[in-house]
Amino acid sequence: MTQIHPTAIVSSTAEIHETASIGPYCIVGDNVSIGAGTKLLRHVVVTKNTRIGKNNEIFQFASIGEDCQDLKYNGEETWLEIGDNNSIREACSFHRGTIQDNSLTKIGSNNLFMVNTHIAHDCIVGDGNILANNVGVAGHVHIGNNVILGGNAGVHQFCQIGDYSLVGGGSVILKDVAAMTLVSGNPAQAHGLNIEGMRRKDWSKETINTLRTAYKLIFKSGKTTEEVIEELTQDFLPQEPKVQLLIDSLLSSKRGIIR
């Protein structure tokens, strides 16, 4: 039987799994679904049109599925989706999408969103990420998998942040972050590969050394992007599949790569 505290307010159109729990003073609005084992601890607001998966834990004063802050938004029916096994800490805010994009903000699984993280409209966040306290992510941003954003980092609209990258605390991201790179500063600049992150994932020395050489080709050779992609594809990719992450970053970038 679903555990719903007597002080909680839950819409009649909400679908709450029998193993989910809704704590004191929570508000769950229309067209919300909450999956098995998910916990809304206390004082959590899930406004509307939100699908939350399994085994998430959402802490007090989080605002989930609220109307976005885009001035073009005019009350259209848009959505927020959250995957499984996420920890969403105090005062986080996740907004629904806009019809100017895909009408959807999408959060993956196994992420940690620390206190006061903001995810704006139409963002796509992958799996296994850590966003530290007070990170602000503007609209239409795409964050890959296994990314770390340090506290108080800010990300400009439409930026992409590649897999396994590390953004230093307080950084301002104005362009795209290539996969596996370490960036920091205001505005952020690249400072090499996220070597420590690779070691924590138990990547081999051979893999890391190959990626180091690939990094130098991208950032220090002076060659055009087209030349770099061709060389990475022909000379690096056959010996190291993870080079594909760097190639994908270059191919998908619309704002240019942080250098």
From Swiss-Prot:
EC code: 2.3.1.129
GO molecular function per UniProt: acyl-[acyl-carrier-protein]-UDP-N-acetylglucosamine O-acyltransferase activity
Subcellular location: Cytoplasm
Reactions that this protein is recorded to catalyse: a (3R)-hydroxyacyl-[ACP] + UDP-N-acetyl-alpha-D-glucosamine = a UDP-3-O-[(3R)-3-hydroxyacyl]-N-acetyl-alpha-D-glucosamine + holo-[ACP]
Pfam families in the cross-refs: Acetyltransf_11, Hexapep
SUPFAM superfamilies, alphabetized: Trimeric LpxA-like enzymes
Keywords: Acyltransferase, Cytoplasm, Lipid A biosynthesis, Lipid biosynthesis, Lipid metabolism, Repeat, Transferase
InterPro entries to which the protein is assigned, alphabetical: Acetyltransf_C (IPR029098), Acetyltransf_C_sf (IPR037157), Hexapep (IPR001451), Hexapep_transf_CS (IPR018357), Lipid_A_LpxA (IPR010137), Trimer_LpxA-like_sf (IPR011004)
GO biological process, one term: lipid A biosynthetic process
Role description: Involved in the biosynthesis of lipid A, a phosphorylated glycolipid that anchors the lipopolysaccharide to the outer membrane of the cell.
Subunit structure: Homotrimer.
Homology family: Belongs to the transferase hexapeptide repeat family. LpxA subfamily.
Full protein name: Acyl-[acyl-carrier-protein]--UDP-N-acetylglucosamine O-acyltransferase
Species assigned in the record: Psychrobacter sp. (strain PRwf-1)
Classification of source organism: Bacteria, Pseudomonadati, Pseudomonadota, Gammaproteobacteria, Moraxellales
Gene assigned in the entry: lpxA
